[in-house]
């Protein structure tokens, strides 16, 4: 649904439908409708849904927040519930999908400390695809370095699904580490060394991680033995 044809009354009606839902199915369907509108006016309600015990509705809410994009970020950050693990986990997924740098600290913390492998996996992917181009050069470099550091530390994660996503995140981040910048060559070297370490890890339990690291290195034109 195009936001250009939605009036405030339309958005309010969609929000009220979510608030009035009296069954799991009703909540899911109402959330889907609100998410499909992708209107910033529905962001607060979608964030609220993240805290409900309804995974289907939460998935729809995350999709809606990602569709809204940057206008939803402040609402997500302001309303992250530190006492509701489920809501926070879904919020991490939304921030990872949006890719706004305002979510950097949350993604760093999630990759390093979250108890859920699926949340750490989402954070790893998110750290690799933050939208850095609009930033000033110095801020872009500093942000890329923070993403790199978090991902390098994530190489030691105990879950292979997270390590796999770290590989994806590192490969996605690589273009932001421009070799013509002062720190670029050293940062790229760290990134390549992290990928090589994952490729050569003799204790890796999941060969798919090694294969994905090899593919990333091949795409980067880096010899890895």
Language-model features, listed with the residues they occupy:
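Structural detector for internal amphipathic alpha-helices that build alpha-solenoid repeat scaffolds
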Residues: 1-6, 16, 24-39, 44-51, ...
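Short, Lys/Arg-enriched segments at the junction into DNA-binding effector domains
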Residues: 113
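Short terminal alpha-helical segments
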Residues: 12-19
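HEAT/HEAT-like alpha-solenoid repeats
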Residues: 86, 142-150, 183-196
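Short amphipathic alpha-helical segments that mediate assembly, nucleic-acid/protein binding
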Residues: 10-11, 27, 43, 188-191
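Conserved binding-pocket/active-site segment within a compact domain
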Residues: 129-132, 146-149, 154-159
